[in-house]
From Swiss-Prot:
Name this polypeptide is given: NADH-ubiquinone oxidoreductase chain 5
Function: Core subunit of the mitochondrial membrane respiratory chain NADH dehydrogenase (Complex I) that is believed to belong to the minimal assembly required for catalysis. Complex I functions in the transfer of electrons from NADH to the respiratory chain. The immediate electron acceptor for the enzyme is believed to be ubiquinone.
Cell compartments where the protein resides: Mitochondrion inner membrane
Bilayer topology term: Multi-pass membrane protein
Example GO BP: electron transport coupled proton transport
Organism annotation: Metridium senile
Single Gene Ontology MF annotation: NADH dehydrogenase (ubiquinone) activity
Catalytic activity line of the entry: a ubiquinone + NADH + 5 H(+)(in) = a ubiquinol + NAD(+) + 4 H(+)(out)
Keywords per UniProt: Electron transport, Membrane, Mitochondrion, Mitochondrion inner membrane, NAD, Respiratory chain, Translocase, Transmembrane, Transmembrane helix, Transport, Ubiquinone
Keyword flag Oxidoreductase: no
Stated family: Belongs to the complex I subunit 5 family.
Name of the encoding gene: ND5
Length: 600
């Protein structure tokens, strides 16, 4: 049962990838979706056994690293953390597979697409079930590879090529941090499996543990798109919309947060690293919320909301509230997948149009999709008693208790205001405002088939009820919850969210009568700064990439390639041989007495 949850998605990927022409588009969709349904069923049984019955399971399959220096087994670990992640990964992936069978209808490469999705799911399951760092790193690299393949699925588009390469290269920076962390762990502890490392971590010097945690956090920053290495995430929207839902809701971006939660015994021995994690998480939540406020691409608005919510999860890890971070990760998966798939339904209805300025008035054409996006947006905003309310507000309450990190609480609260503002802006521009769509496109907009709408219904139910149904299970993992927070602080996120939503409605409905900020010098400068994503791409390209390129051209190309290596390589050898042959040819003078002298 335990191994099947891992192998069945791999079987679906292999069959769809190798025999796609034999089974056809429908066959590939049905087979891969069926494999994921089986995997989801086993995940539910594993959740019942490990989480509800408190039965942790370890499975050693084979020894795959065996030397005098290090020994590592290929093994599986099923505990409460793994069980929750399996539910999230397999449920979201199953619904994305079903949605893709309709969304990708007519594409000539559907079997390849379904194969990539199943392979993506397999590597994520491998990542969350690993019992040691090297095996986790295999899944870590696997989801990175699959994200490259899926973002670049429409490989004839130059923007998709650039986005896929960017995602791969930016994540390489984080991967280097992860590799350095593994080397430091092995050097410090002499082992790489979780159980051994966590049992002896208290004996290690705090400085070494802090260094290990910072290296691990660099890996998490790359994968979970935190401040500085977040630039690949909005560009990943070049892939098909189901890919965006899978990457942002259940797989790749959650891997970094999972790494922090899994490594929590290490982080608890490094207070300085926890402070860095909190600072970066809170700044990411605020930064991404401000950028999402001015984006015009429907999918990019949701992408930046993902980045902001990941900041909340990382901030919770920095506050040592790992169970609450996992709770928000699980809740976020449902309403974020709902938002992305609903956005895919809108794009599908408008003949692949993604610019919100060219939409509007769709509430009459696709009312079902409108309802789904409203549910997802309200849950994202933390509207009372929806799924997001139980975890997002709890993170902010717990941040209030940290006096030396009080700024994290206020950044989080203000980010909640901005989240409500850009969520209402998305709804208003897409569905309520006067339409700017082309007449022939707008007149033909309609809801999709059952396999487009069924996943949305199930995700909507999750976005409404999952938080309420699972809060007692997740909260039971916590040792303590602060009982002294004033009621006003508890209500503050909701009040700020309602204020942000109301402000967005007023500004977009009556903006022409109130003010003309975007055309004023200050408003234009602020809008440009936010729309350009705080100029991060310019800063990275101008100050980092170009200088590295110049340095590489000067040292690697001119000094080494065209200098030292040429002298001791082909150019030096050729010049030496030419001189040698000239010296030898000079001996052949044609004079008899010279030859006689040489003989003597």
């Amino acid at each position: 049962m335990y191994i099947l949850v891992l192998t069945v998605p791999l079987l679906g990927a292999l069959v769809s990838g190798l025999f796609g022409r034999k089974i056809g588009e429908k066959g590939a969709g049905i087979f891969t979706s069926g494999c994921l349904i089986i995997s989801l069923s086993w995940s539910l049984l594993i959740f019942y056994e490990t989480t509800l019955n408190f039965s942790t399971t370890y499975i050693k399959l084979w020894r795959w690293l065996d030397s005098d220096l290090v020994t590592a087994y290929f093994g599986l670990q099923f505990d409460s953390l793994t069980a929750v992640m399996l539910i999230v990964v397999t449920s979201i992936s199953t619904l994305v597979h079903i949605f893709s069978t309709a969304y990708m209808d007519g594409d000539p490469h559907v079997p390849r697409f379904m194969s990539y999705l199943s392979l993506f799911t397999f590597f994520m399951i491998l990542l969350v079930t690993s019992d040691n760092y090297p095996q986790l790193f295999i899944g870590w690299e696997g989801v990175g590879l699959c994200s490259y393949l899926l973002i670049n699925f429409w490989l004839t588009r130059i923007e998709a090529n650039k986005a896929a390469i960017k995602a791969m290269l930016v994540n390489r920076v984080g991967d280097i941090g992860f590799v350095l962390a593994m080397l430091a762990i092995w050097d410090q502890f002499g082992c790489l499996d979780f159980a051994s490392v966590f049992n002896i971590v208290a004996l290690a010097p705090s400085d070494n543990t802090t260094l290990i945690c910072l290296f691990l956090f660099i890996g998490a920053v790359g994968k979970s798109a935190q401040l500085g290495l977040h630039t690949w995430l909005p560009d990943a929207m070049e892939g098909p919309t189901p890919v965006s839902a899978l990457i942002h809701a259940a797989t790749m971006v959650t891997a970094g947060v999972f790494l922090l939660i899994r490594s929590s015994p290490l982080l608890e021995q490094a207070p300085m690293a926890l402070m860095v994690v909190t600072i970066v998480g809170s700044l990411t939540a605020f930064m991404a919320a401000t950028i999402g406020l001015v984006q015009n691409d429907l999918k990019k608005v949701i992408a930046y909301s993902t980045c902001s919510q990941l900041g909340y999860m990382v901030m919770a890890c920095g506050l040592s509230q790992y169970s609450i971070s996992l709770f928000h990760l699980m809740n976020h998966a449902f309403f974020k997948a709902l938002l992305f798939l609903s956005a895919g339904s809108v794009i599908h209805a408008l003949a692949d149009e993604q610019d919100m300025r060219k939409m509007g008035g769709l509430i009459r054409s696709i009312p079902f999709t409108y309802t789904m996006i409203v549910i997802g947006s309200l849950s994202l905003m933390g509207f009372p008693y929806l799924t997001g309310f139980y975890s997002k507000d709890l993170i902010l309450e717990l941040a209030y208790d940290q006096y030396y990190l009080a700024f994290a609480h206020w950044l989080g609260v203000f980010s909640a205001l901005l989240t409500a503002a850009y969520s209402l802006r998305l709804i208003y521009l897409t569905f309520i405002s006067n339409t700017n769509a082309k007449k022939e496109v707008f007149s033909q907009a309609h809801e999709g088939s059952w396999n487009l709408t069924l996943p949305l219904i199930l995700l909507a139910l999750g976005s409404i009820f999952v938080g309420y149904l699972t809060k007692e299970i997740i909260w039971s993992f916590q040792i303590t919850l602060s009982p002294i927070i004033p009621t006003s602080i508890k209500l503050m996120p909701v009040i700020f969210s309602l204020f942000g939503a109301g402000t967005a409605v007023v500004l977009y409905h009556y903006s022409s009568r109130i003010f003309n900020a975007p055309t004023s010098p200050v408003g234009l400068a602020g809008y440009t700064f936010l729309y350009s994503a705080w100029q991060f791409n310019y800063i990275i390209n101008h100050f980092l990439v170009q200088n590295v390129w110049r340095l590489g051209h000067l040292i690697t190309f001119r000094v080494l390639d065209k200098g030292v290596l040429e002298l001791i390589g082909p150019k030096g050898i050729s010049q030496f041989m030419i001189r040698l042959t000239q010296e030898i040819s000079n001996l052949q003078s044609g004079l008899v007495y010279n030859y006689a002298l040489m003989i003597l």
